[in-house]
UniProtKB/Swiss-Prot annotation:
A ubiquinone binds at residue 201. InterPro entries: Cyt_b/b6_C (IPR005798), Cyt_b/b6_C_sf (IPR036150), Cyt_b/b6_N (IPR005797), Cytb/b6-like_sf (IPR027387), Cytochrome_b (IPR030689), Cytochrome_b_C_euk/bac (IPR048260), Cytochrome_b_N_euk/bac (IPR048259), Di-haem_cyt_TM (IPR016174). Coiled coil: none annotated. The chain crosses the membrane at residues 33-53, 77-98, 113-133, 178-198, 226-246, 288-308, 320-340, 347-367. GO terms for biological process: mitochondrial electron transport, ubiquinol to cytochrome c. This is Cytochrome b. Keywords: Electron transport, Heme, Iron, Membrane, Metal-binding, Mitochondrion, Mitochondrion inner membrane, Respiratory chain, Transmembrane, Transmembrane helix, Transport, Ubiquinone. Its main location: mitochondrion. Heme 1 (or BL or b562) is low-potential and absorbs at about 562 nm, and heme 2 (or BH or b566) is high-potential and absorbs at about 566 nm. Belongs to the cytochrome b family. Heme b b562 binds at residues 83, 182. The lineage of its organism: Eukaryota, Metazoa, Chordata, Craniata, Vertebrata. Component of the ubiquinol-cytochrome c reductase complex (complex III or cytochrome b-c1 complex) that is part of the mitochondrial respiratory chain. The b-c1 complex mediates electron transfer from ubiquinol to cytochrome c. Contributes to the generation of a proton gradient across the mitochondrial membrane that is then used for ATP synthesis. It comes from the Eukaryota.
Amino acid sequence: MTNIRKQHPLAKMINHSFIDLPAPSNISSWWNFGSLLGLCLMIQIITGLFLAMHYTSDTTTAFSSVTHICRDVNHGWIIRYLHANGASMFFICLFMHIGRGLYYGSFTFLETWNIGVILLFTVMATAFMGYVLPWGQMSFWGATVITNLLSAIPYMGTNLVEWIWGGFSVDKATLTRFFAFHFILPFIIAALAMVHLLFLHETGSNNPSGISSDSDKIPFHPYYTIKDLLGVILLLLSLFSLVLFSPDLLGDPDNYTPANPLNTPPHIKPEWYFLFAYAILRSIPNKLGGVLALVFSILILTLIPLPHTAKQASMMFRPLSQCLYWMLVADLLILTWIGGQPVENPFIIIGQTASIIYFFIILILMPLTNLLENKLLKW
């Protein structure tokens, strides 16, 4: 058995990636989220495949086909809710994974980090298009509002929006192409995840101390396979608790009303995992400025390694940076809350303040804190 594992070309690749992979001996449970993201992607692809067998991407029947899946298809309701809530779990793991990377300085692995940011954009695009497919009120108006943002691009904006819509409004052509893209993108995400892993295995994993662990490595199996298995059990327990007890907790009631272009919902808002970016978009009165802030709120992750001048990558021994980090987390939670509130005072001013603080912490306070901590090290 050992010979096959170490000699067969395919088995050898798996062996080097998941079995005999040298891993730091001190990585904590924060390193579990990579494997959990892989599990979430598998759940989404499998449930999505079964949903696609019964879904019709036509404006007249899309809403009815989702209702049909829930009512008439054998176990259709659980497949539909696993897919919808699986997306929420995906984003929870994604945010935890990025948060760990920021805290422990994993952004110093530039290729791995930048592929990760591309993955984040791709997952966000996939989730947005998936939200349009049930063709409820929030699906339709969410698609209209978000795609309309591209019209803010000077000179070519209007043509670009009409090209994406496939007409002069969000209609059948839009729904059909969104379904096609939503189907193919998860496989592109899987390929990008492979590249992400490839770059990670070039450098080896980071660890909480931020110190090189080359002198102290242990094999990935059985130590971290068992550890990952615990994460898998907890994730599945959380997901099934959500699906079986309160499947609509994270959804919007408006999406149980079929799409009606003549009736605008009082508050158009995306799924909870986009609310922080939506709050940043809404906090700027100018359309183009809002779109740029929205894109930059995610793209800013690629800039994090540039002003990083600290002697230590990890924040484990840097209390000032830790304070800033948790301020950033609190700020993102405030932005998420504001994104779900109506556009009226005091929410407008809170959203604008939180947006300024978000960029101020990342672009100005974090680099300054790095310099200050370097000075303190010399004392």
